[in-house]
């Protein structure tokens, strides 16, 4: 009987359409042990001068570090967005590849875990500005404009700008699994001190593979910008935001970060609060236009919500000493930190390796830094969780009992 049915079954299978698997059906999360082992840290200089780091890990495990040119007068970036790739988990790095030019780097580089496509978001100049979407279908080797891509306004009629945000994510859990989501912001007409109190963070999301990008409801607090998002294992999305200005008469600690949550896949944000411990850059550089861009990632560990956050850890007014904080309970507490870069440094971006690839078990931090100036060069640190566990305890909560130290 089986021998008679087999040809028909095979014939039918040949004509089945091929669609990318939803991210939730893909094996994107592994075991805690892959991030453990012997404590290890390596440093690589990837870029000279310029700014704006974003780092992602392609579906095949290729690490893609992106960088953008910045002109002193906020003019057009002649060299645009460039990337360097590593196919061996970060040991060696290929040459510079141009994503788009001339342009500014909008950040929010996003890997679609269903199709493997990677999206980047150039802007014609310092925003507000014309913007477009670029895509790579070969893990960052080549890039092309998505001709039919559209970014829709929010309910207030405001089309957000892309510059600058931490890398985006693909949602893996719940009814919105497969959705692409990245932070974005509205500049309130221009980046000047008078507009700071009206600016707000937001997010854009795509349910059609990166062609149509809808804008979420605004972040609950004004004066925000340069956000980062991470999805927890229960499907909630955590939003961590830089602060540029607070309402008049505010009694908030001006050195700390805003955070909020989404339970609908990034459509709305609620429960905004000041994080108890995470610094918003140098603690004494507070004032209009203060704060600092930060990195954020959830380690792809099954059933665990280990979040990493990176920013300057300076008690002075100088941006320096990029440090990584660790939460083992999905941003409830941050009991551990370790400095990665000693000296002048600023913006940083975080990501983590994928199970079953050369990147597995590694954590990646791309930062601005140098010996004499914080914007001197672009450096890539790769390390593991064991290395972070040798850091110092912060007093904000305790290390979990399930953690094998």
Predicted stretch roles:
Residues 1-5:
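N-terminal secretory signal peptides that target proteins for export/translocation
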Residues 6-7, 43:
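Generic N-terminal leader/processing signal
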Residues 8-20:
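Bacterial N-terminal signal peptides
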Residues 24-405:
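Asp-box/BNR beta-propeller blade signature and adjacent active/binding-site loops
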């Amino acid at each position: 009987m089986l021998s008679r049915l087999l040809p028909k079954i095979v014939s039918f299978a040949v004509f089945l359409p091929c669609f990318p698997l939803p991210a939730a059906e893909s094996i994107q999360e592994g075991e805690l042990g892959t991030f453990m082992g012997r404590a290890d840290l390596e440093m690589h200089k990837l870029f000279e001068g310029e700014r704006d780091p974003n780092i992602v890990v392609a579906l095949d495990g290729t690490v893609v570090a992106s960088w953008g040119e910045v002109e002193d007068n906020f003019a057009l970036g002649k060299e645009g967005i460039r990337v360097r790739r590593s196919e061996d988990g970060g040991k060696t790095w290929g040459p510079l590849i141009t994503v788009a030019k001339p342009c500014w780097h909008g950040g929010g580089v996003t890997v679609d875990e269903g199709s493997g496509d990677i999206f980047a978001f150039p802007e014609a100049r310092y925003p507000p500005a014309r913007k477009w979407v670029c895509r790579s279908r070969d893990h960052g080797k080549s890039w092309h404009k998505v001709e039919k891509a559209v970014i829709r306004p929010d309910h207030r009629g405001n089309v957000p700008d892309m510059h600058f945000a931490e890398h985006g994510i693909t949602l893996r859990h719940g009814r919105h699994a497969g959705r692409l989501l990245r932070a974005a912001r509205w500049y309130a007409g221009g980046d000047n001190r008078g507009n700071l109190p009206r600016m707000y963070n937001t997010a854009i999301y795509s349910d059609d593979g990166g062609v149509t990008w809808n804008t979420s409801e605004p972040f609950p607090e004004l004066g925000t910008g340069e956000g980062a998002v991470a999805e927890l294992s229960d499907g909630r999305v955590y939003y961590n935001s830089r602060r540029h200005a607070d309402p008049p008469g505010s009694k908030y600690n001006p050195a700390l970060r805003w955070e909020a949550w989404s339970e609908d896949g990034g459509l709305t944000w609620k429960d905004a609060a000041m994080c108890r411990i995470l610094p918003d850059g140098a603690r004494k550089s507070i004032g209009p236009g203060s704060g600092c861009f930060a990195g954020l990632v959830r380690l792809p560990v099954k059933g665990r919500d280990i979040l990493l956050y990176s920013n300057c850890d300076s008690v002075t007014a100088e941006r320096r000493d990029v440090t990584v904080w660790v939460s083992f309970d999905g941003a409830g507490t941050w009991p551990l930190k370790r400095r990665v870069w000693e000296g002048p440094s600023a913006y940083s971006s975080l990501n983590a390796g994928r199970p079953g690839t050369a990147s597995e078990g590694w954590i990646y931090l791309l930062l601005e830094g140098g010996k004499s100036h914080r914007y001197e060069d672009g450096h890539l640190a790769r390390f593991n969780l064991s290395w972070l566990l040798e850091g110092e305890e912060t007093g904000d909560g305790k290390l979990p009992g399930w953690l094998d130290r």
